[in-house]
Amino acid sequence: MRLIHLSDLHLGKRVNGFSMLEDQRYILKEILRIIDEERPDAVLISGDVYDKAVPSAEAVLVLDEFLCQLAQRKLPVLMISGNHDSAERVAFGGRLMERSGVYVSPVYDGAVQPIVLHDAWGEVRIYLLPFLKPAHVRRCFPDETIDSYTDALRVAVGQMEIDAGVRNLLLTHQFVTGAARCESEELSVGGADQVDASVFDGFDYVALGHLHGPQSVGGEHIRYCGSPLKYSFSEAKQQKSVTLIELAEKGQVQVRTVPLVPRHDLREIRGTYLAVTGKSFYDGTATDDYLHITLTDEEDVPNAIGKLRAIYPNLMKLDYDNTRTRGAVQLEEAAPVEELSPLDLFAQFYRQQNNQPMTQAQTDFVRDLIETIWEEDAP
């Protein structure tokens, strides 16, 4: 049996203010092309279908079209909700969609019934486990001791009564200990959301979602396929791909990947303003890629973003790396928060959010605003 493993579509996502919907439509068409070439027996989608719990109408239409295209190919689709999704919204209409071969994880109630597929070696049981927090599992099993994500997943998996004599697959959307994260993924304080890979010992393949970098963790059969597109510059060096799973008899699993080529790549470049605007620098490159440009000039270039976008229209982010910015970073790191004034704290926050300092006019405005607030609060 051949399966295609996808996750983290994040339909409707905006990156640095740029809508990714057209790029998402494009990459889903590329995935359909790969499906037509590889002829899988089913498609697995491991959560974060949408980027928001309440997706835009346009994002819903993109998913609807993709699922319809898969259903027209008579391909079973097995899909779960992730931490970005609303489990209730993703599950809506699920029982009706089963008639078209689209199986969606219901809202978790403690019971997970497998979807059973067949091939020459017999049954393949596929369990759909949506993103879970410990609180979700505690509500269903109040007598169990559940103090961590590992406890929660161990209890949830333990209730499945897995038959070790057949091939078992799991779709889930969690952070497995030891995996590498990216900036575009939600983080929890102190890594509290980590799940130990031993929880999944009873499965022949675990189709993970949540992390955007394709990787295996705790064994080749426990795998994040990664997101189909780059959603932050921390992913700039990643090769996005589709994961294909080849299931033979019990215990025989092979994994391979097919690279994905996006409509626009997401890249980082650096150099002086004169260098990056020189024709010899950008000639022959895809100047309409999504770019983070770091200028190394010692002085700020007036209207740099506007000038650079004349060459690089999809410039997403601009910052400087020079003596001044490096000194500012060192100063920020050295100064304890309690020693900074409200204005200094806001200036740091602004720089972190915008990758550039406030102008003098902005600084004066914020200073006046802070003074007004302090005067109003004074007894």
Regions found by a protein language model. Name each.
Residues E37, A42, L247-P379:
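Accessory, non-catalytic peripheral segments of nucleic-acid enzymes
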Residues V112-A120, V124, L129, I222-T287:
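Binuclear metal-dependent phosphoesterase catalytic core
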Residues M1-C68, Q72, T363-T372, E376:
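N-terminal active-site segment of His-dependent metallophosphoesterases
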Residues Q72-V77, V166:
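A short helix->loop->beta-strand "cap" motif at the edges of active sites that frequently abuts
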Residues P55, H84-G218:
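His/Asp/Glu-rich metal-coordinating catalytic cores
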Residues D41-G47, M79-S81, R167-L171:
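Short beta-strand segments at enzyme active-site cores
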